[in-house]
Curated annotation (Swiss-Prot):
Any single Pfam family the record assigns to this protein: BTB
Residue intervals of the BTB domain: 16-86
InterPro entries recorded: BTB/POZ_dom, SKP1/BTB/POZ_sf
PROSITE patterns named in the record: BTB
Top-level division of the source organism's lineage: Viruses
Protein name: Putative BTB/POZ domain-containing protein L834
Family: Belongs to the mimivirus BTB/WD family.
Length: 262
């Protein structure tokens, strides 16, 4: 199927068989659509056009949480990606609400980077209630909870989860700040001391860099160890410190980033 042609039919108002009026608390807007596309894409519309009186109607009115967001969702049924308003916290939250209203899948990834102002926190709680309260969503709440927010408004269960998650995050942060990593090349009798704890992706890219420029060999044996921040490396004198290579790797990463943006 040519999805570009399908979307063009929507834009040109060709062969449509239903006018969908989307109304919310502020206003109403209309979109011409095709029942077969709506039914195939969304269980809400499938039931609407098969089980209820709307199945024989060419114009229907639906009261929705946000008319603009639902319009964008319908356009998405035509495989046209609408650029989400990633900097609009209200749009991000309403997208979850509207997808839930239509019976579409929702998950925490949809709001993982959302930052809401004070007036948006109550809506954030309602949205997360739809998604579910687990580590990721509790973390989103912790990141957004206002400094002077009256936590007594929240349920005891949610407060317990926030408290437990905060303790875990603080513990992980404390452990990260109090540890240091060593990469030991036992084949070359060299070691590298990292100034902070890096994720495994960084370590892998660094090893690829070292092998790419023939400093190390991909057949060498590497060992990654984590030690307390005040740990003094007791490496035998035959082991040499080549931590200066981190500076070259940093330059390499910056150059790589510039090339990707050009």
């Amino acid at each position: 199927m040519d999805h570009n042609k399908l979307y063009q039919l929507l834009i040109d108002d060709k062969f449509f068989d239903v006018v969908v009026e989307l109304t919310d608390e502020e206003d109403v807007l209309s979109i011409n659509a095709h029942k077969i596309i709506l039914c195939a894409s969304c269980e809400y519309f499938e039931k609407l056009f098969t089980l209820f009186r709307e199945k024989n109607q060419s114009k229907i009115t639906i009261k929705v949480p946000n008319r603009y967001v639902v319009r964008d969702i319908i356009i998405g049924f035509y495989k046209k990606n609408i650029q989400p308003c990633i900097n609009n916290w209200k749009y991000q939250l309403d997208l979850v609400v509207c997808r839930d209203f239509l019976g579409l899948k929702i998950n925490s990834d949809m709001i993982k980077n959302v930052i809401v102002p004070l007036e948006g926190f109550e809506l954030l709680i309602k949205v997360i209630d739809l998604i579910g309260f687990f580590d990721e969503t509790i973390g989103i709440i912790i990141r957004n909870i206002p400094k002077d927010y009256d936590k007594s408004i929240l349920s005891d269960e949610l407060l317990d989860k926030i408290t437990n998650r905060t303790e875990v995050l603080n513990k992980n942060m404390s452990e990260t700040e109090s540890t240091i990593q060593f990469i030991v090349n036992s084949s070359k009798y060299q070691y590298i001391k990292l100034e902070m704890s890096h994720k495994i992706k960084y370590i892998q890219e660094f090893l690829e860099f070292m092998c790419k420029y023939d400093v190390w060999d991909n057949k060498d044996k590497f060992l990654l160890t984590v030690k307390p921040i005040d740990y003094k490396c007791p490496c035998p004198t035959k082991y040499s410190d080549v931590s200066f290579m981190i500076k070259f790797f940093t330059i390499y990463l910056e150059a790589k980033k510039v090339n990707l943006t050009n």
